Design a protein with these regions (language model features):
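Acidic/polar-rich alpha-helix caps and helix-coil junctions
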Residues: 1-59, 94, 98-321
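Short, cationic low-complexity segments
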Residues: 60-86, 137-143
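Catalytic and ligand-binding motifs that coordinate phosphates/metal ions
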Residues: 90-91
Length: 321
């Protein structure tokens, strides 16, 4: 995929598509630790708690930094969703991505995955019988009101540690079947198989449509105006199909750590991040001096000690450093 070897990538996904892996029926249940190593998870870092390891260091140490605050969690507050990401979940009257960066309002129709992925003010948080509040967020005025939700384990769960180091037993997913479907759809578009790509993306969207939606605290109604539909019109334009696949990748994999690397792989990191910063600077003052330098910021520098420690000339520094 990173080398643009589309036929090889397409062929490589065939064996996985024909295997015993598959999509979990419910999107929300995919991220419950009691469902670790389910049929969708292909490769994951295994985590556990209360297993005799000192300080519970087999737990999800990284995920503890996501803890959103409030009455049930510590307030580390890292990996905060941006307003731009929240807006990406807005949909049209037809239930398809609106591709709008206008700030979401309460009555807007939204993809139901938003409230499984992101903590939003006045939306129930997990199964805790409480509404997420903006003031849970660390440094609200600087970083905004939204918090992570997808990989946060309920404080009611026996797989969540309520004392230091506040870790959980939720495995860290490296590759899941949903992403393989997205890979295959991407390769299919580049190979001109647009209708197959549409059907693949519809598999992802159909799972989201048929999953349980977040409800109001009394369980009587959906917590927001959820709408999601399949792509019903055949795809005939490669550029439009490519954009649809990339958008679906962003929504399905949000906050799972893939977005930046996908932007680099697609060769659009400079444009997307620069456009993002132009608007997001007006929303978040800590970004006022942020910028993206093309042909540099796509990659981190190679440690000089590594370059100096091997045969001279064998490794050269990345561009711009």
């Amino acid at each position: 995929m990173f080398q643009g070897e589309w036929q090889l990538a397409y062929d490589a996904t065939t064996a996985v598509m024909n295997s015993n892996y598959g999509l979990m029926d419910d999107f929300q249940e995919l991220f419950l630790p009691e469902n670790d190593n389910n049929k969708e998870v292909i490769f994951a870092v295994q985590q556990s708690i209360n297993d005799g390891q000192p300080s519970n260091y087999n737990g999800s140490i990284g995920d503890r930094l996501l803890a959103p605050g409030g009455p049930f969690y510590a307030q580390y507050g890292f990996h905060r969703p941006s307003q731009n990401l929240v807006n990406a979940f807005k949909v049209t009257a037809e239930g398809l991505p609106a591709n709008s960066n206008e700030n979401l309002i309460d009555t807007d129709p939204v993809d139901p995955r938003i409230d499984i992925t992101i903590g939003r003010p006045d939306i129930p948080y997990k199964d805790l019988d409480i509404l997420y509040q903006a003031d849970w967020a660390r440094d609200l005025a600087t970083y905004g009101a939204f918090g992570p939700k997808k990989r946060i384990v309920s404080a009611n769960s026996p797989y969540h540690l309520e004392v230091w180091p506040y870790v959980s037993a939720l495995n860290y997913y490296i590759i899941r079947f949903g992403e393989v479907i997205l890979w295959r759809a991407e390769a299919a578009v580049e190979l001109g198989k647009l209708e197959e790509a549409r059907q693949l993306i519809n598999q992802i969207r159909e799972r989201a449509k048929n999953s349980a939606y977040v409800k109001t605290l009394d369980g009587s109604n959906d917590a927001a105006n959820y709408e999601i539909e399949l792509y019903k019109t055949p795809w005939t334009d490669k550029s439009v199909a490519r954009d649809a696949v990339r958008t679906e990748s962003r929504l399905e994999l949000a906050l799972e750590g893939h977005r930046f690397f996908n932007l680099v792989r697609w060769g659009i990191a400079d444009k997307v991040i620069s456009d993002y910063l132009e608007v997001e600077k007006t929303r978040r003052t800590h970004l006022s001096n942020a910028s993206f330098t093309s042909d540099k910021n796509e990659y981190m520098p190679i440690p000089q000690a590594y370059i100096d420690g091997i045969e001279k000339g064998l490794v050269t520094q990345n561009k711009g450093y």
